[in-house]
């Protein structure tokens, strides 16, 4: 799924929100953004997000409000932030960054649509049933794929063919930090190299 499709998902969810609105909800739809990182770590993503919303006819402050909750890499804050967004009755939750963001959003609501952007496999982590039919109130985009990881490892091997070991750096605080370990190990074994995670 490309950026345009991602923005269309978010825009479509925000556009559909007024149809289900009741007297208790704000007049202008609110998009809740739940991020595992900081504002500086997501600057380029935020610019693309706003540009895509504008292409879909949504301008922050004019016809949509965006509320950000950023965990600053303190993942234990995400469940409370997700609950805040649910309490705010947002139209859609955009969960990005570490896999814990969409999981926190998913645990907080089974009704509000959730659109995720993450770098791990959402099927392997148990977030969705499948990429084509995610199920429930969640859908999104992933930048992870075993094909991508295999290509990255292949390029690494071409750049440093004499390397005897290859290492993968992970964030041990991210509960899905070992998702890429199996394909990484498989590739390392195939080229007869030691793998360090």
Feature-to-residue mapping (PLM):
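Short hydrophobic alpha-helices and adjacent helix-cap/hinge residues
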Residues: 1-197
């Amino acid at each position: 799924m490309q950026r345009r499709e991602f923005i269309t998902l978010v825009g479509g969810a925000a556009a559909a929100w007024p149809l289900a609105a009741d007297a208790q909800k704000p007049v202008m739809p609110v998009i809740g953004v739940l991020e595992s990182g900081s504002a500086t770590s997501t600057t380029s993503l935020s610019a693309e997000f706003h540009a895509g919303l504008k292409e879909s006819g949504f301008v922050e402050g004019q016809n949509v409000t965006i509320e950000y909750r950023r965990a600053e890499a303190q993942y234990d804050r995400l469940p409370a932030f997700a609950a805040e967004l649910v309490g705010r009755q947002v139209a859609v939750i955009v969960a990005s960054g570490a896999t814990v963001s969409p999981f926190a959003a998913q645990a907080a609501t089974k009704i509000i649509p959730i659109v995720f952007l993450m770098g791990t496999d959402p099927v392997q982590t148990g977030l969705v049933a499948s990429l084509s039919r995610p199920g429930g109130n969640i859908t999104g985009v992933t930048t992870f794929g075993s094909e991508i990881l295999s290509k990255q490892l292949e390029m690494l091997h071409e750049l440093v063919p004499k390397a005897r070991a290859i290492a993968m750096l992970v964030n041990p605080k991210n509960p899905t930090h070992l998702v890429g370990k199996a394909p990484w190990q498989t590739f390392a074994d195939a080229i007869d190299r030691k793998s360090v995670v």
